[in-house]
Amino acid sequence: MTLERGQPWGSTAPLPDDGIIVASDTEAASAVATARAAGRAVPVLGLVGGDLCRTLGGTGDAARLRTSDAVTLPVDIAEVDVDGDVHVFLAHVIARRSWWRGQVWAAMNAEWLGRWDIAPRAHPGDGLLDTFDASLGLRDRARARRRLETGTHLPHPAIEQRRVPAARVALDEPLDIWVDG
């Protein structure tokens, strides 16, 4: 279910008895991947940590998840194929060699990556990924990095930003890949 302008998104309800409490984006993606691999429905997840939790305004209070104040929201589930290995992700995929040189590519479903507001317009229920492709010089990279905490690194002429339902990218050189971690 994709978010639509002017329509309610989510509802208040306690985490179901079979819901799974997860403390990180890695745990959340693993729970989804495990259910899919077993042919089961994706479980309702109670987020108490991670970038997706922060994006959704989560407080990290596990006890609150079992109360009627808990909010249940549908979020997009994405996949990335890395050299033939398919991985589920809920928050982000980052491809880079170094933060200080070379290409950096990101697909963001969550707004945050740690303390950085990388994708200020990202919404985990809109059916879109916010992708970023950057190869900045050292001076511009340092300036952009200082502005990441507030999300004011954008717009930037050397950072290509797109909002897309799917992305296919061929990287310029071999890069390390981080999936929800």
Annotate each PLM feature.
Residues 78-80, 105-107, 131, 167-169, ...:
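Generic structural hydrophobic/aromatic packing signal, biased to beta-strands
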Residues 84-94, 121-126, 150-155:
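Short low-complexity stretches enriched in small and charged residues
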Residues 12-13, 120-122, 158-159:
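Short secondary-structure boundary/capping segments within folded domains
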Residues 69-77, 126, 163-164, 169-174:
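A short, compositionally biased
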Residues 133-181:
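ATP/nucleoside-binding phosphotransfer catalytic cores, i.e., glycine-rich phosphate-binding loops
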Residues 100-144, 149:
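Internal helical hairpin/lid segments
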Residues 1-112, 118:
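Catalytic core of DAGKc-family lipid kinases
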